[in-house]
């Protein structure tokens, strides 16, 4: 008698191997930090363990289109002092990727105009490596929360706080962390009363002295920042900052050493890395975009601090992580003043993650390699539910 139609014994049937978790690496975006985000994505795609994870690279163009892109990390590096662009990597100039709209179904769909949408399969976790507005500021995180898709890094509130330097400093102050003097010029102030806005800054300089740093309130990677030595350069600095954000922040220059510390979420809670020191770049007025990414000004890892100073900056970095309700990872930036006091400058909820970035270097020196860092972040996201937590 033929047995081909008889029920199989489940214990004797060949079992389908478990599906590997699928990670969508989302990068690019509409902010001024588009190119650095692409470089970061290239580093993550090169480091992620393909034996453990399936990977889906999704780039967001400068005009906001979600595109399927080539999985070719070697094309995502800085070349000839130029950062790459999602449009150069996109598989189509018109097609778009659609996220799930039902939390019970995590299937991602690709759609071309005039064609039947194509299912790309389920995504288990999103690794967003976007920097700046429309990606690092809580907007993307809110979209993923609505879709019910787990994601790497800070949630909606922490991302928003970490992006807006004014509210970040307010949160730190309320939790007892020391911040430097600053002033804020909101869009309406500059647009309706420029003389009043200028007077506000001049009065601030009169109290705290020149030079000042004028910067976008909601941007990173040192983009749009100008060091202003006197009143003559003020208007130009304001307009440069406003090219990136209509709201600007003015900070007093602090004399001291620039110290950074990484925070990473482990199973038992956040831990701090060994700190790093950013020496004054010889060819730049301060640690600007060119020094960070183009000329690769090297940091000192670990920072030459005393044991007591190291322990204190690590404590403060974790305190900043907790104050902003962060998750996943943070880089906390401090000044160690001439009075031997740590003043927190800012946190980055998605810090620079390129091979030359300080965050991976600090964790490498702490015993966590770049591939392990990527793996820990993905695993933390897989453990964490979306929604209120």
From Swiss-Prot:
Chief location bin: cytoplasm
GO terms (BP aspect): cell wall organization; peptidoglycan biosynthetic process; regulation of cell shape
UniProtKB keywords: ATP-binding, Cell shape, Cell wall biogenesis/degradation, Cytoplasm, Ligase, Magnesium, Manganese, Metal-binding, Nucleotide-binding, Peptidoglycan synthesis
GO MF annotations, alphabetized: ATP binding; D-alanine-D-alanine ligase activity; metal ion binding
Record-linked InterPro entries: ATP-grasp, ATP_grasp_subdomain_1, D-Ala_lig_Van_CS, D_ala_D_ala, Dala_Dala_lig_C, Dala_Dala_lig_N, PreATP-grasp_dom_sf
Entry's EC annotation: 6.3.2.4
Pathway: Cell wall biogenesis; peptidoglycan biosynthesis
Superkingdom of this protein's organism: Bacteria
Catalysed reactions listed for this entry: 2 D-alanine + ATP = D-alanyl-D-alanine + ADP + phosphate + H(+)
Compositional bias per record (Polar residues), positions renumbered to this chain: 1-12
Signal peptide limits: none
Binding positions (Mg(2+) 1): 333, 346
Names of the cofactor(s): Mg(2+); Mn(2+)
Chain intervals for the UniProt region annotation (Disordered): 1-22
Binding-site list for ATP: 205-260
Family that this chain belongs to: Belongs to the D-alanine--D-alanine ligase family.
Biological role: Cell wall formation.
Name under which the protein is recorded: D-alanine--D-alanine ligase
């Amino acid at each position: 008698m033929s047995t081909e139609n008889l029920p199989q014994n489940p214990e004797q049937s060949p079992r389908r191997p478990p599906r590997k978790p699928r990670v969508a690496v989302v990068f690019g975006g509409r902010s001024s930090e588009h190119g650095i985000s692409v470089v970061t994505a290239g580093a993550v795609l090169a480091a992620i363990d393909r034996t453990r994870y399936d990977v889906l690279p999704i780039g967001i163009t400068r005009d906001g289109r979600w595109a399927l892109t080539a999985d070719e990390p070697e094309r995502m590096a800085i070349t000839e002092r130029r950062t790459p662009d999602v449009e150069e990597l996109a598989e189509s100039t018109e097609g778009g990727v659609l996220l799930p709209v039902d939390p019970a179904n995590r299937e991602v769909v690709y759609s071309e105009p005039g064609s039947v949408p194509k299912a790309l399969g389920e995504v288990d976790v999103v690794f967003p490596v976007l920097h700046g507005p429309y990606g690092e500021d809580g907007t993307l995180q809110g979209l993923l929360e609505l879709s019910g898709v787990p994601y790497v890094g800070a949630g909606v509130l922490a991302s928003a706080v970490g992006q807006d330097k004014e509210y970040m400093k307010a949160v730190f102050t309320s939790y007892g962390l020391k911040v430097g003097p600053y002033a804020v010029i909101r869009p309406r102030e500059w647009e309706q009363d420029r003389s009043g806005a200028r007077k506000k800054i001049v009065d601030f300089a009169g109290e705290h002295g020149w030079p000042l740093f004028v910067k976008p309130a909601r941007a990173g990677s040192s983009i749009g920042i100008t060091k202003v030595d006197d009143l003559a350069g003020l208007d130009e600095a304001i307009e440069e900052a406003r090219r990136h954000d209509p709201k600007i922040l003015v900070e007093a220059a602090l004399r001291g050493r620039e110290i950074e510390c990484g925070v990473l979420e482990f199973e038992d809670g956040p831990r701090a890395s060994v700190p790093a020191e950013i020496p004054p770049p010889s060819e730049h007025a301060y640690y600007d975009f060119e020094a960070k990414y183009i000329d690769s000004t090297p940091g000192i890892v670990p920072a030459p601090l005393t044991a007591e100073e190291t322990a204190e900056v690590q404590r403060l970095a974790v305190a900043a992580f907790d104050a902003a309700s962060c998750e996943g990872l943070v880089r906390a930036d401090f000044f160690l003043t001439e009075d031997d006091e740590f003043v927190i400058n800012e946190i980055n909820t998605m810090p620079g993650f390129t091979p030359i970035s300080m965050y991976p270097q600090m964790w490498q020196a702490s015993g966590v390699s770049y591939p392990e860092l990527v793996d820990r972040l993905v695993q933390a996201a897989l453990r964490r539910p979306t929604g209120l937590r």
